[in-house]
């Protein structure tokens, strides 16, 4: 790199997040470009922290398994499935099941989430993946 680009880079490293955001807006206006195309490079850290809109296009890798409801006659079976999946004690698992809709597990892989969903639905629970 040239001395000029090194100097610019060092200046950019000292910017706060708010200042960097303002700089991006000014660059977009001055050059008639959009930072959305290069968001993966320029906005990598903020995108990871503020997930949402950007992730809609990408396939999710982490899921929350949420027990929405269950058949009253299947409460004990659902309770056993939740205990097995979470490793919770009887009292904690019972409280979790009775608090439905309630997240049973959060941030699990797609395979694990689907397996847990299948196990709970087989015994009478209604589960969604978020």
From Swiss-Prot:
SUPFAM superfamilies assigned to the protein according to its UniProt record, in alphabetical order: ClpS-like (SSF54736), Ribosomal protein L7/12, oligomerisation (N-terminal) domain (SSF48300)
One GO MF term: mRNA binding
Assigned keywords, A-Z: Ribonucleoprotein, Ribosomal protein
GO BP annotations, alphabetical order: translation
Superkingdom, natural source: Bacteria
CDD domains for the chain: Ribosomal_L7_L12
GO cellular component assignments: cytosolic large ribosomal subunit
Family affiliation: Belongs to the bacterial ribosomal protein bL12 family.
Function (record text): Forms part of the ribosomal stalk which helps the ribosome interact with GTP-bound translation factors. Is thus essential for accurate translation.
Subunit structure and binding partners: Homodimer. Part of the ribosomal stalk of the 50S ribosomal subunit. Forms a multimeric L10(L12)X complex, where L10 forms an elongated spine to which 2 to 4 L12 dimers bind in a sequential fashion. Binds GTP-bound translation factors.
Protein's name according to its UniProt entry: Large ribosomal subunit protein bL12
Species per Swiss-Prot/TrEMBL record: Synechococcus sp. (strain WH7803)
């Amino acid at each position: 790199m040239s001395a000029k680009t090194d100097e610019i880079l060092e200046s950019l490293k000292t910017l706060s997040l708010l200042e960097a955001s303002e700089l991006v807006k000014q660059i977009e206006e001055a050059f008639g470009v959009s930072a959305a195309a290069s968001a993966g490079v320029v906005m990598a850290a903020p995108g990871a922290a503020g997930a949402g809109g950007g992730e809609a296009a990408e396939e999710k890798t982490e899921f929350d398994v949420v027990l929405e409801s269950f058949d009253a006659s299947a409460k004990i079976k659902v309770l056993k499935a939740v205990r097995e999946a979470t490793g919770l004690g009887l009292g904690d698992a019972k409280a979790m099941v009775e608090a439905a809709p309630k997240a049973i597990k959060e941030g699990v892989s797609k395979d694990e989430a689907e397996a847990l969903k299948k196990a709970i639905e087989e015994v009478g629970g209604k589960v969604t993946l978020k």
